[in-house]
Design a protein with these regions (language model features):
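Redox- and metal-dependent alpha/beta enzyme cores, enriched for Fe-S-associated oxidoreductases
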Residues: 53-95, 147
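Short, flexible loop segments at boundaries between secondary-structure elements
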Residues: 88-91, 128-151
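Residue-level signal for inorganic ion chemistry
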Residues: 18, 63, 112
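Conserved beta-strand/loop subsegment of P-loop NTPase cores
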Residues: 15-25, 39-59, 81-86, 133
Length: 151
């Protein structure tokens, strides 16, 4: 299992040591056809929003490995994203960053939204002004995958 995306491990060497691959969303890169190794099992998964937030106009921001993926997910789930701001992966938001985001959102009458991963790194006194986009993965045949992980 490997994360795929920018600045991640190359697929071919990673798959040689992997036992299974979880493909999130559509197999746009045709991984299952290109890399047919005997030792690999492929599982598909879909991202589901845990809570559907109120219909608002959003200013989305994140500091994860694939910020554009987060923004695309929001829009694909029907969120009205008017503005976006990307930070580096694992970014530690400063109070100055958060004040700037809040000011920009207020000027344009937007609500701030970020990933759950980023939300937990934000000081608590700012969280009340920021919506958290929580997701879960739905994996058909998850029991088979769990057995594979245990064995």
């Amino acid at each position: 299992c490997l994360p795929a995306g920018p600045l991640r491990e190359l697929i071919r060497p990673a798959l040689k040591s992997a036992q299974f691959v979880v493909i999130i969303g559509d197999d746009l890169h045709h991984i299952t056809k290109k890399y047919d190794y005997d030792n690999l099992e492929f599982y598909n998964a879909n991202i589901k929003a845990v809570d559907v937030l109120d219909k608002k106009r959003y200013f989305a921001f994140s500091g994860i490995g694939n910020n554009d993926g987060f923004f695309d997910t929001l829009m694909n789930k029907g969120y009205d994203v008017k503005k976006k701001k990307s930070f580096p992966d694992h970014y530690q938001f400063t109070r100055k960053d958060l004040e700037s985001l809040l000011d920009k959102a207020k000027i344009e009458n937007l609500s701030l939204i970020t990933t759950e991963k980023d939300y937990v790194r934000i000081p608590e006194d700012y969280r009340k002004n920021i919506d958290c986009f929580k997701i879960k993965l739905e994996i058909p045949n998850v029991e088979k995958l769990i057995r594979k992980l245990i064995n």
